[in-house]
């Protein structure tokens, strides 16, 4: 156990050296954006009612890290879940559809989990949730995956996402291209 704690503390130390650090407890927000990547598109719709959970080590919340050390929680998923417990969002939304961590987040406080597709899917580039078997693209199934709403480009892509335990899949086209006026 001591070896695990030491490895975790060493990893945190090196992350802190490379990351921006936040010391205060996360504040309550109605919406939590999971992963800063592509969040600028979501921010246009959300105004100031959101916060961002940084998932690529660009920013680390020391308050959450300390809480997790005290509780002997050492994984990234546990860090994310603890962060969510403090923010208490009604909605967790992401524009990153190929991060398995999003699908594995615990559902507490009756929040809704929403995923918006931002790119085309391919098992060549998205090996985290897609696989290619005998020339056929399939979704990596996991009983623990869960998401309430997935907004996809079209019904064909929607068929792939059905296997991610989504309650509802909605076709909206590309949210990025919807920012441009047709001439």
Where are these regions (language model features)?
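Donor-nucleotide binding loops and adjacent catalytic segments primarily
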Residues: 183
């Amino acid at each position: 156990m001591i070896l695990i704690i030491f490895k975790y503390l060493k990893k945190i130390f090196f992350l802190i050296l490379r990351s921006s650090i936040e010391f205060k407890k996360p504040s309550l927000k109605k919406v939590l954006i999971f992963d800063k990547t592509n969040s600028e598109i979501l921010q246009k719709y959300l105004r100031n009612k959101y916060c961002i959970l940084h998932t690529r080590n660009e920013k680390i919340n020391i308050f959450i890290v300390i809480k997790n050390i005290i509780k002997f929680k050492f994984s990234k998923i546990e860090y994310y879940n603890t962060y969510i417990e403090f923010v208490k969002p009604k909605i967790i939304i992401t524009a990153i559809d190929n991060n398995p961590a999003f699908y594995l987040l615990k559902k507490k406080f009756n929040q809704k989990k929403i995923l918006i597709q931002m790119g085309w899917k391919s098992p060549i580039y998205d090996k985290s949730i897609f696989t290619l078997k005998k020339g056929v693209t399939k979704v990596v199934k996991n009983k623990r995956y869960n998401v309430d709403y997935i907004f996809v480009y079209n019904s064909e892509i929607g068929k792939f996402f059905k296997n991610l335990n989504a309650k509802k899949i909605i076709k909206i086209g590309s949210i990025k291209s919807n920012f441009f006026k047709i001439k």
